[in-house]
Amino acid sequence: MEKQYRVVIIGFSHMHINDVAAHFYENPRTDLVAGADTIPLVPELKEGTFTRKWNLEFCRTNFKIPKIYEDYREMLDQEKPDLAVITCENAQHLEVMYECAVRGVNVSIEKPMAADLSMAMEMIRISNTYGVKMFVNWPVTWRPELHLMKDLLDEGKIGRILEFKIRVSHTGPLGDGAKHPGVKITAEPGGIKANAAEAPCWISAAMAL
């Protein structure tokens, strides 16, 4: 019999959790057993669509999350999950990932992985130290056409990369039509520009700056 995986959500500041949670809810081998928000670095000044309160209630209602905790550390201790989905502010990724790792909980981290390279390297060190699996929810690298392009480039079959140009149409970290004062402070650094730079670094095998 295949193992059933217990999954918890930590952080509801990122609007992508509404899509990510749907995938775990629909997967027959994963159970969304609980969720908990983190304490915001900057309190939200407005209620509305794609705020953290709205995201939490949307996920709780639509994906039948049975328990919501005030403290994510208590949730980790009580629920003993196999996997924690981390969708808090970018600046809190390291802290939350560490609390999961010391408890032996594997993590899925919403892109971008970290606010800067030093934070990312520390997260890798923690993952190795505590023997937990860590992956970044970065769908662009799962697309077969991009893997084919990278393979052809690595094999020298379609020339040499000279320059990357990226055009991004993006509504920001909250979602279409949602504008909430203060969100930029907790979303940066490591926002959409850092996220866009990851694909060229991966394709060209260059180290991120």
Regions found by a protein language model. Give the residues of each.
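ADP-ribose/adenylate-binding Rossmann-like module
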Residues: R103-D116
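N-terminal glycine-/serine-/threonine-rich beta1-alpha1-beta2 phosphate-ribose binding loop
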Residues: M1-R103, M121, R125-Y130
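Rossmann-fold dehydrogenase core element
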Residues: E122-V140, R160-F164
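Conserved G/P- and acidic residue-centered "switch" motifs that form tight phosphate/ATP-binding loops
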Residues: G11, K111, G156
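Glycine-rich phosphate-binding loop at the start of an alpha helix
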Residues: L94-E95, L117, R143
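Rossmann-like NAD(P)(H) cofactor-binding subdomain of soluble oxidoreductases
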Residues: Q92, P112, V136-W142
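Predominantly a Rossmann-like dinucleotide-binding segment in NAD(P)-dependent oxidoreductases
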Residues: M15, V140-L209
